[in-house]
Amino acid sequence: LQMNAAGDRLVVGAHQNDGSGTDAGHARAYSYNGSAWVQLGADIDGEAAGDNFGNNVSINDAGSRIAIGGQYNNGNGSEAGHVRIYDYSPDTDSWSQVQSDIDGEAAEDRSGFAVSLSASGDRVAISAILNDGTANNAGHVRIFDLKPAPDTVGPTMTITATDGSNAVADGATTNDNTLTVTFTSNEATTNF
């Protein structure tokens, strides 16, 4: 779960929810109206059984954009994983997907294990904890600048563990230019 900067919006993942299949997962967002937490829009369900959608979630400072990880999604190979980005429309009380799915690079990457939106929501960091880029299961974090649809989204930076330890975006994005990335036995702060 994660709360926005003002503390009046919250996104919660339930990765073993069975709404669209066993363990498909889902996420819900809530807004505090001064006396109670009220759901914003409908549940956002995972694509298929076993996706574990909602295993990690993030919300921008305004509470108008969320990122949801589904580390076991099979869109680009078995357990490649993916992340979906949604914007909230108060006019229709609904969430709509902003871009196409951001899929893991290869089978068993488990992309979406951790996700972190920047304060503005214009940048997202996505951890693929078992990506084999520099070593078997070394993991990496890809950072994407989100562009207005229908522009293509591509990574602007990839942070990898050179020693074989797993790279995890721990969600500690402090502003739009700094991200803390934790490796199994190390920690690094990167400016971009």
PLM segments and residue spans:
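Extracellular/surface recognition and adhesion modules
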Residues: I44, I102, P155, I159, ...
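Conserved beta-strand/short-helix segments
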Residues: L1-A149
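Short, solvent-exposed loop/edge segments of extracellular or virion-exposed proteins
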Residues: T152-A172
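Structural beta-strand segments of beta-rich domains
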Residues: N177-V181
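Short proline/glycine-enriched turn/loop motifs at strand-loop junctions of beta-rich domains
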Residues: S185-N191
